[in-house]
Amino acid sequence: MAINLNEYSLLIKDQIKKYANKIISDQKGYIITIGDGIVRVSGLDDVLLNELVEFENGAYGIALNLEPNSVGVVMLSDYYDLKEGSSVKRTGKVIQAPVGDGLLGRVIDPIGLPIDGKGELKNISGYAPIERLAYGVMQRKSVHQPLETGILAIDSMLPIGKGQRELIIGDRQTGKTTIALDTIINQKGKNVNCIYVAIGQKNSSVAQITRLLEETGAMAYTTIVSATASELAALSYIAPFAGVTIGEEWMRQGKDVLIVYDDLSKHAVAYRALSLLLRRPPGREAYPGDIFYLHSRLLERAGKLSDELGAGSITALPIIETQAGDISAYIPTNVISITDGQLFTTTSLFNSGQRPAIHVGLSVSRVGSAAQLKSIKQVSGSLKLELAQYRELDTFSQFSSDLDAETKIVLEHGARVMEMFKQPQAKPIDQTSEAVLLFGIKNRFIKWIPTDHIIKFKEFILDKIKQDQVYKKIEEKKAFDDEIEKELTAFFKDVVKKYTSTLVDYNGSLYGDLKELE
């Protein structure tokens, strides 16, 4: 058989073209010590800070400490079958989180694995590194749009704007999480994507929150990132960063995002545990020296982007738990100085039945007033001052039984206003209805109602106002003019008469001159 040299040469040339001379370099190391979720590794001389490393059993860790002779790695998954001498290799990647609309309605862990039993994540647009620089000053815009919480006390006196960072701070069991969840529930139909980051909570608490959001229909636009108390400290450490990375993708698309960190006290404790185990030098309260930077680099990623960048926003509601009301402790003062205001909840208000238990005197919103709706701003200007006077006189009235008429008026009005601010969980009020209620407070129409009937009277107003034409006018104009004020005055006189007519043994002359209602 004759050998066709041309065919052979063509085959050889074809093989040469297909041949790719790739050199794959793999840097491997080995475990020196292991324990408490921390692994010391030798041999990874070129590893990067925050780089993912892979162990021989398929587990992953993050290189957090780069030392001359070893690397301190924090574990992200089970490490019980690893031992001294086991091999470990670099991945060349930093830790990433999934992003995209496929995350809405899902519960995931900080490394992006679904934990809600609904199968794999779908419609994911990609993965993004969880550590990223915040946008600069020139890439931002000042806060100017309101973020409606649906909570009357907040929207009237402590308004929050889109792109603001408002701290919710208070002792345990004072309704901090409830305020955050009510704000999420109120975003229904407002084109705001929500992220709830659970840090160091019980599995049962996360399940309860998921159920509440599903029952209220809020889960359709919400993602839950959960790092529970039973998991490794490293997952609690990365959870908020994973959450804000998910939000940043939506913000870049020009969308509005609300993110809740519940809570950053446990986040700081998790970071302290990791730092001490990595033998980093402890500082005040045994926290490491960069604890302030930990929270500042997280919260600075929230904000309102400029029009050139799509005008998207991330509004952050970090939660901090205090011990015995001490807001001057290390972590609380750190986060207060980073954020744009705080809502302070107290045990005494909560136990007295004032819920949400917001202490208006110690709470502040530094940038929210620029974003407040005009109709609400017109009728809520004097509220904070009135309540401050009420609290002061209420304290003194406990020592004196003989009060003058003017003091009695301030005390009675203050007590009624506090009743108006009581609100049950998952029952948000729309901003037009809030403006109407505040109009009634400002013009003292609530003085005709006995204090123990204020809550029922409030429900009566909310029921009647939506059937009235003036509601649509306020909704359209988003401000009060002379015509609307005239119509609202007539509306309130009418509802006061109708409501008081249902009360047994009611004597209107005890509350003022009845001619005012004519």
Curated annotation (Swiss-Prot):
Sites annotated Required for activity: S363
Pfam families assigned: ATP-synt_ab, ATP-synt_ab_C, ATP-synt_ab_N
Protein topology in the membrane: Peripheral membrane protein
Subcellular location: Cell membrane
Chief location bin: membrane
Physiological role: Produces ATP from ADP in the presence of a proton gradient across the membrane. The alpha chain is a regulatory subunit.
Listed name of the protein: ATP synthase subunit alpha
Species of origin: Mycoplasmoides gallisepticum (strain R(low / passage 15 / clone 2))
Classification lineage: Bacteria, Bacillati, Mycoplasmatota, Mycoplasmoidales, Mycoplasmoidaceae
